[in-house]
């Protein structure tokens, strides 16, 4: 899938400027103008904040270094961070989702499964990175846990960012170049090390963004976009780094989108006896039959059932 950004909304007059949202903190947004000028802080018009990092926007200058967002361009997709009480959009116009795992500490398969469902539901290419392959005592165990995901067709890239940084950089760039990629990872997996490997001035950029957004010392509490260096053929791409893996929710997804977000379910869905089968306890359910005979892992079906339950608790 192409990593090219969607077409930006047209700026109708000289007082309006097009740009890309590169960071967000509350109702504060940092926008990089299309003309290559200095980034400036922007605010949405009105009380509601419907802007996400990765959005193409049009803003009106309110002062030399501030603007008001007046238009949001057409989106390829939109990802949410959600809990039982609310959903908040946080990233837009992606085409890939990268999950950073490690041989140690022990990674959560529940969180991995949720990330893969989010990728499938938003038509993003999922990419699993297994870091710390130098920890040989834990390597085979981690590989064994990831084997079912490889069997589903998911790409797993093995790296040792700390011990073999250049090899890791080459392996990662091959998959990231030309794509807009959301980066997710639990604490301790090496996500920050990965960002610093690929974006040498990431820490400096983070401090500058934090200052521009008036977020002070809370440098890890905002979503931000880092442009990737251009390759020889001129294709760069972007990394979108967002904190709070555990908060990454799926409550806004309908049951229909959830069932199709499990690739092993999709070929079996037409075989259910009832067209509105929930795949939980219905007779003649092709999914439950596949779980019973081992074609679908019980853990994957349990995740589906849990996500259906969580979605049912939301007042829509």
Swiss-Prot record:
Annotated CP-type G domain ranges read 83-248
BP-aspect Gene Ontology terms:
ribosomal small subunit biogenesis
| CC cofactor | Zn(2+)
Keywords tagged on the record: Cytoplasm, GTP-binding, Hydrolase, Metal-binding, Nucleotide-binding, Ribosome biogenesis, RNA-binding, rRNA-binding, Zinc
Known EC number: 3.6.1.-
User: Where along the chain is Zn(2+) bound?
Assistant: 272, 277, 279, 285
Q: Does the keyword Lipid biosynthesis apply?
A: no
Q: Which parts pass through the membrane? A: none
Coiled-coil region: none
Q: Which Pfam families match?
A: RsgA_GTPase
- What are this entry's molecular-function GO terms? GTP binding; GTPase activity; metal ion binding; rRNA binding
Q: Name one GO cellular component term.
A: cytoplasm
Q: According to the UniProt record, what class of enzyme is this?
A: hydrolase
InterPro entries of this UniProt entry? G_CP_dom, NA-bd_OB-fold, P-loop_NTPase, Ribosome_biogen_GTPase_RsgA, RsgA_GTPase_dom, RsgA_N
Q: How is the cofactor bound?
A: Binds 1 zinc ion per subunit.
Q: Tell me which Gene3D superfamilies the record gives.
A: Nucleic acid-binding proteins (2.40.50.140), P-loop containing nucleotide triphosphate hydrolases (3.40.50.300), Probable gtpase engc, domain 3 (1.10.40.50)
* Record SUPFAM superfamilies: Nucleic acid-binding proteins (SSF50249), P-loop containing nucleoside triphosphate hydrolases (SSF52540)
* Residue numbers binding GTP: 131-134, 185-193
Transcription regulation keyword on record? no
Q: Which cell locations does it reside in? A: Cytoplasm
Q: Give the UniProt family note.
A: Belongs to the TRAFAC class YlqF/YawG GTPase family. RsgA subfamily.
Q: What does this protein do?
A: One of several proteins that assist in the late maturation steps of the functional core of the 30S ribosomal subunit. Helps release RbfA from mature subunits. May play a role in the assembly of ribosomal proteins into the subunit. Circularly permuted GTPase that catalyzes slow GTP hydrolysis, GTPase activity is stimulated by the 30S ribosomal subunit.
UniProt subunit comment: Monomer. Associates with 30S ribosomal subunit, binds 16S rRNA.
The protein in question is named Small ribosomal subunit biogenesis GTPase RsgA
Write down the species: Paraburkholderia phytofirmans (strain DSM 17436 / LMG 22146 / PsJN) (Burkholderia phytofirmans)
